[in-house]
Amino acid sequence: MKKVIKVLLSSIFCLSTLAGCSSSPYTKAEAQTLTIQGVPVYVEPDEETTQEDIDTFLKAIKAQPEFLKKNCTGIHLQGENAFINYAQQNFGDKYNKTFGYTIGEDVFLKTNLNVNGSKRDIDSVKDTVAHELWHVFDYANGNDEYYLSEFDFNILYNQNPGSISEYGATNVLEFFAEAGTMYLLSPEELKEKNMDVYNYFESLPKE
């Protein structure tokens, strides 16, 4: 069976005008279920989650291409306490400090925007949402035993594992997600770092 992957994620900026929200950005978020381009999005706040937090993540999700979202069966936007409690139930304490992870084709994100005294911006959140969705893509396009990245792409990883990022060098799954995110958000940078990897992502089906 495939291994469960758990990965990093983050948050950002207010979507109030786009979402039709006229209330204060500090208004507490309420639990609800939304659909974005066919993907169920479950808002699971705690007492500290603001509507600004949620609107930021919704904006980042909407910005992702449809081909990357089509295999995703659900995105859970969780307040920090809800995120930690769920992670502990499933994985113990190991993932308490992460900002997100995936289980199969579901994505779980911690919606806390403030990290170590600073606030994450929209670009940071788009980056991490894309990273998680590439893990879903990797999982969904593999088979019962292996992720997609564990086939031909594994050769590219082994040739130069540190070419994309320090985190990407961890293993082929992270290399794939980091490279895919760069392909979407900074394609020229990916070309400079590893043209063969860029060409691989260029050849992937995107329908």
State what each model feature region is.
Residues T17-A31:
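Sec-dependent signal peptide cleavage junction
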Residues E132-S149:
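Catalytic Zn2+-binding segment of zinc metalloproteases
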Residues M1-K6:
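Positively charged n-region of N-terminal signal peptides that target proteins for export
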Residues N81-T128, V136-A140:
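Active-site scaffold of zinc-dependent metalloenzymes
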Residues E150-E207:
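Metalloprotease/metallohydrolase-associated module, dominated by Zn2+-dependent proteases
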Residues S10-T17:
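Bacterial N-terminal signal peptides
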Residues Q37-E105:
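Auxiliary, metal-adjacent structural segments of Zn-dependent hydrolase domains
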Residues E47-D55, K119-T128, T170-N171, K191:
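Soluble non-cytosolic domains of exported or imported proteins
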